[in-house]
């Protein structure tokens, strides 16, 4: 067993029988009381965020997470199909396990599948940045504004993001999959 001194941000721990991601934590020593560690935890299954206080030095159970790079093959309804490029083993992942980044998964691209406890799927981490083609964009009118203006565009995966007015249909853009924000236009 590990102690609270082993905590790290984004670590997966088992707390009260459920898996949680450590969003943030800090050590607190109030006057003449015993020191404590205050953790902000996000439940993996429900997505609910809680704040938990434990004594400094108390034991915590760290869940060993294994990352395996796999190729995204295709989507069938709300099931995503991935393949291990070394063993050619295929797995199915439900859309709710992937979460928001699902809208940035492009066929034949690589993503990291997170496993725990004898090959149970914890989630999917797509690449931090993806390059996608703009399939739908409204036309920007010259002289329309005096300041920076963004417009909504639809990408080839169906995701809708906000981009600067100079981005047109058919352009390629780089997107941050963690936030869903436009980074740059690719020439």
Curated annotation (Swiss-Prot):
Natural source organism: Roseiflexus castenholzii (strain DSM 13941 / HLO8)
PROSITE patterns: EFP
Family per record: Belongs to the elongation factor P family.
Cellular localization per UniProt: Cytoplasm
Protein name (record): Elongation factor P
Gene3D superfamilies per UniProt: 2.30.30.30, Nucleic acid-binding proteins (2.40.50.140)
Keyword field contains Protein biosynthesis: yes
Keyword 4Fe-4S applies: no
């Amino acid at each position: 067993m590990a102690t609270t001194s082993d905590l790290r941000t984004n670590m997966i721990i088992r707390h009260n029988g459920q898996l949680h991601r450590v969003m943030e934590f800090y050590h607190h020593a109030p006057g003449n009381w015993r020191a404590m560690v205050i953790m902000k935890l996000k439940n993996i299954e429900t997505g609910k965020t809680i704040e938990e206080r434990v004594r400094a030095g108390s034991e915590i159970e760290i869940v060993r997470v294994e990352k395996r790079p796999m190729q995204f093959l295709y989507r069938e309804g709300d099931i995503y199909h991935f393949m291990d490029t070394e063993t050619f083993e295929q797995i199915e992942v439900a859309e709710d396990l992937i979460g928001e980044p699902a809208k940035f998964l492009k066929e034949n691209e690589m993503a990291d599948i997170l496993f725990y406890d004898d090959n149970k799927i914890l989630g999917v981490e797509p690449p931090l940045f993806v390059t996608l083609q703009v399939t739908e964009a409204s036309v920007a009118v010259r002289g329309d504004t005096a300041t920076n203006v963004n417009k909504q565009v639809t990408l080839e995966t169906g995701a809708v993001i906000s981009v600067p007015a100079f981005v047109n249909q058919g352009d390629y853009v780089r997107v941050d999959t963690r936030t869903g924000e436009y980074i740059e236009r690719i020439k």
